[in-house]
């Protein structure tokens, strides 16, 4: 039986949570909506308690993205993600955070069939994770589903432009909106999603002019990823911006080389184990 995660204050100096319950002061969906045109919104992906603890003080939103398919599970794309995966990782991120609004991706196949299917699965995710909202990919075709959800109390973040769950139809992860017809369609998608009640919209992998036009046209905040600095906020896959992978998309800035840091630390450990210089008396219980 699933239960909502307990409210905890987290000690970020360790990997363990302080068991003393404290009042939460999370950013809410209405407060995110109010950020339209204001200070840019900071969003990153998180999949685990510890990463949520580290990101939370600096972020307005944490996205439990279906990008965990590649980052955590080594899958080739996001199509293979399940509801169980999203529920487990979503609950972990909620437990590991206290400030940021947590958004959970709805996996491929969990919402496209009908508005009722989408509601049932979205309600399950919110119940099992304690997250603030769900995110869905799609435009005009999905607008009735978004309206159905929002009218029934489920906050929805939209996602237009390059939609990774549609990789099999799109044929890859190339930039969208290069033709006038496709550019117009993406703008129409975003407007339809906003009018359906989405509280914010991710714009991914489009020409900058398209992202700016959408940001100027819709009343809700836009979150760019490979879009434009003029969006109302930005999101990246955390492991990409930390430099955990050798190959990253053009729109990623590597703020650290964490792959090098981890590799170096493991090499030092391995060398010390093989030379019997670890553990030392500092790490041994004498007796």
Curated annotation (Swiss-Prot):
Active site residues of this protein: 204 (proton acceptor)
A molecular function (GO) term: magnesium ion binding
Catalysed reaction equations from the record: 3-methyl-2-oxobutanoate + (6R)-5,10-methylene-5,6,7,8-tetrahydrofolate + H2O = 2-dehydropantoate + (6S)-5,6,7,8-tetrahydrofolate
Cofactor(s) demanded: Mg(2+)
One Pfam family named in its UniProt record: Pantoate_transf
Gene Ontology cellular-component annotations: cytoplasm
Record-stated family: Belongs to the PanB family.
Free-text function comment from the UniProt entry: Catalyzes the reversible reaction in which hydroxymethyl group from 5,10-methylenetetrahydrofolate is transferred onto alpha-ketoisovalerate to form ketopantoate.
Protein name as annotated: 3-methyl-2-oxobutanoate hydroxymethyltransferase
Native source organism of the sequence: Sphingopyxis alaskensis (strain DSM 13593 / LMG 18877 / RB2256) (Sphingomonas alaskensis)
